[in-house]
Amino acid sequence: MGCHMVAVLVLTTFVCFVIVDYFLQTRRPHALKVVAASAEPEEVSFPINIVSGFKLPAGLSYHSGHAWAAKESRNVVRIGLDDFAVRLLGKIDQLDLPARGRWLRQGEKGWTLARGGHRFEMLSPIEGEVVDVNPEVLKDPSVIHKDPYGTGWLVAVNSPAADSNLKNLLRGRLAQRWMEESVATLHTHVSPSTGVHLQDGGHAISDLLSILPEERWERVVRELFLA
């Protein structure tokens, strides 16, 4: 009889532990979901090539109007300015970015940048609906200059034809040759008599417009941005 009572007590204790553990487990999933939902997405970095003094990360796709595109998911593509555009414009005073819900067309006007009373249009590298706008660059355009391929991104677009759009852009060796041609074109606008060099210690200077007469700014930018 004594052994029987011990067995019953052991079984009862085990059942109690199971019941307590069950209730504890049913109260945990909400906390786990919050952690999962708030987790930052893993950043993907690419090797950065230096082409004629300008940064040109591998793994991105480039529009010949000097905007980059990076696919983030099946149809979502993030867009920004390349290093050439940023260094050409120098200090950006204002940005006019497309609002959420606006439909962009590949190769057509996407946004406008302003400097010193001059306004410069740029072309969208991707067609689709704007689903996100970077508030940081609207508050402080200098963010673009500090990190054009990272925190200085402009907008994200939901593009149903993302893959076919990206095939129209430049990558790899083609992108490098295009960058070299853009730099060569810029050289034609810089008078040798000024004694100014586009590069400073291997990298392009950070305010290329400043070495050009202001009355030529808009013509030079339109030619290079294809706008």
Language-model regions: role of each:
Residues G2-A227:
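Contiguous, well-folded functional domains in the mature portion of proteins
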